[in-house]
Amino acid sequence: MRILVTGATGYLGGRLVPMLVEAGHEVVCLARTPEKLDGLPWRGDVEVVQGDVLDAGGLKDAAAGCDAAYYLVHSMASGKEFAEEDRSAAANFRDAADAAGMRRIVYLGGLGPEGEDLSPHLASRHEVGSVLASGETPVTELRAAVIIGSGSLSFEMLRDLPEVLPVMTTPRWVRTRCQPIAVEDVLDLLVQAIGDDGESRVVEVGGPDVLTYQEMMAVYAEEAGLRKRLIIPV
């Protein structure tokens, strides 16, 4: 299968691509800055196309001939425009997939219940899933909780704070409960999802344990052999 991957320069995309290659797929990586992929061990095994999801014409050219695609990009910028950019990018990608006659789009969104107060970024990620699924190409949307793995932003934060500060004054969100999931599990699910058939669907994925960020930092400190950390939410 010929697969278009956006976000190949990112944390998950850079780990997903070699798994797809190993599975026998022909991979096309769309990157705004292709040079970021130079030197990676799998660079010679893939086709790299310079492009941007906000460029509708270039995106359609990159998608032509592809059977399926991964949408692994979203804006983390601040300001009022990020949601509009996310919306436009998703619409461009939906249209490019439809024009190419793709079998499936796999999108990694964020876990959060519908109908509740969501952060602007999480609400935008849900909206992106809806925009992608509004076209002709079926979409598998994986909504993941906090992804834990070496190098992930979540893990680095959970590690760095206990490593540096024996006493921490933290925001109240450290008491927010979530279902952390290992990056290896997310990658396995992404690889499996490209083989989905049938209609669009949303799949919520998380690990077996429900923990607060405070509890996760305490677990890390214990596993790392650090003295018990005092965490004071304010």
Task: Identify the residue ranges that each predicted region occupies.
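Short-chain dehydrogenase/reductase
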Residues: 83-87, 117-129, 133, 147-148, ...
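Conserved beta-loop-beta element that borders a ligand/cofactor-binding pocket
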Residues: 109, 130-153, 157-164, 169-172
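N-terminal Rossmann NAD(P)H-binding glycine-rich loop of SDR-like oxidoreductase domains
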Residues: 1-25
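SDR active-site strand-loop-helix element
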Residues: 6, 30, 72-73, 105-110, ...
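NAD(P)H-binding glycine-rich loop region in Rossmannoid oxidoreductase-like domains
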Residues: 35-100, 110-115
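Mid/C-terminal beta-alpha module of Rossmann-like enzyme folds, strongest
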Residues: 2, 193-234
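Conserved glycine-rich Rossmann-like NAD(P)H-binding loop of the short-chain dehydrogenase/reductase
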Residues: 25-32
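Substrate-positioning beta->alpha
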Residues: 89, 153-154, 173-194, 201-204, ...
